[in-house]
């Protein structure tokens, strides 16, 4: 593969301030960030010849594979996407609320806003509009300005209530929808009828219980929140037990096609310190 080295520029400006308000004590951190890439390296999912691992990017590639008695597989290949800009802001605070010397509430809250932009998306769309081969792979699932597999918003909160040797905690995480995925997985461009790639997707990813990969993703690529709980007790200085429930409400969500997150999970953990 002819991959150029990725070059970039990064700048970040922010401030961190301590605070004490009554029994609250902690820090607040605010930062803005900007990153610019040239020849940014991204991976692209596609169909590959199982014999020589070359990407199938045309009908002639597919015919040659079949006539040579070879098969195909799904894989990913790194390549340059030219220019990209990623910028945004991050706000966080962490600290403790002191009820008394034996009882405390620890907290950590954070929010990130990101603009992950493909700076060359217009030129790429113009070039892809000229494609005539129905098997020629496009960069992503839509014609938007955003890079693949990235959300715009994310929020996370961690709270731990501690009383003597007992700890009760919770995690809350929220993310907005993913802005774009690979073209091999789905095509969000408006069209009047199915094309060859739609049939290829059906063969590659299957069809189950009335769902295709695209219909499942469209249904589940939405903003989602998850909640985790934990209860711990320190039996001695050396031994501690913790019981955790991850994904408390058994939220069904997917952070990328073909990757369904874990359902509700129960974990019992013992820590021993020597």
Segment roles from a protein language model:
Residues 1, 45-79, 189-218:
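Flexible glycine-rich, low-complexity coil/linker segments exposed to the extracellular/periplasmic environment
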Residues 1-36, 236:
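Structural signature of Gram-negative outer-membrane beta-barrels, strongest in the C-terminal barrel
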Residues 39-43:
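Switch/connector loops and helix/strand junctions flanking conserved nucleotide-binding motifs
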Residues 23, 31-36, 50-184:
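Gram-negative outer-membrane beta-barrel transporters
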Residues 27, 64-65, 223-228:
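Short, mixed-charge, low-aromatic patches
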Residues 4-6, 10, 86, 104-112, ...:
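Conserved C-terminal beta-signal and adjacent last beta-strands/turns
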């Amino acid at each position: 593969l002819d991959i150029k080295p990725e070059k970039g520029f990064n700048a970040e400006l922010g401030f961190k301030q301590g605070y004490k308000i009554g029994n609250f004590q902690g820090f607040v951190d605010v930062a803005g960030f900007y990153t610019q890439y040239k020849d940014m390296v991204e991976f692209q999912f596609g169909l590959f010849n199982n014999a020589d691992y070359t990407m199938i990017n045309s009908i002639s590639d597919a015919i040659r594979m079949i006539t040579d008695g070879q098969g195909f597989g799904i894989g990913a290949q790194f390549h340059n996407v030219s220019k990209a800009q990623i910028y945004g802001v991050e706000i966080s605070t962490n600290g403790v609320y002191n009820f008394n010397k034996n009882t405390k509430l620890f907290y950590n809250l954070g929010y990130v806003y990101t603009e992950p932009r493909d700076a060359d998306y217009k030129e790429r769309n113009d070039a892809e509009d000229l494609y005539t081969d129905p098997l020629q792979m496009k960069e992503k699932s839509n014609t938007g300005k955003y890079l693949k597999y990235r959300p715009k918003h994310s929020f996370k909160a961690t709270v731990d209530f501690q009383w003597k040797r007992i700890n009760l905690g919770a995690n809350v995480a929220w993310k907005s929808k993913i802005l774009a995925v690979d073209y091999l997985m789905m095509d969000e461009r408006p069209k009047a009828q199915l094309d060859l790639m739609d049939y290829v997707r059906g063969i590659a990813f299957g069809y189950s219980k009335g769902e295709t990969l695209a219909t499942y993703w469209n249904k589940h690529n939405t903003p989602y929140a998850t909640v985790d709980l934990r209860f711990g007790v320190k039996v001695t200085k050396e031994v501690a037990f913790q019981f955790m429930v991850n994904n408390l409400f058994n939220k069904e969500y997917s952070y990328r096609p073909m990757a369904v997150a874990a359902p509700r999970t129960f974990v019992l953990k013992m820590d021993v310190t020597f």
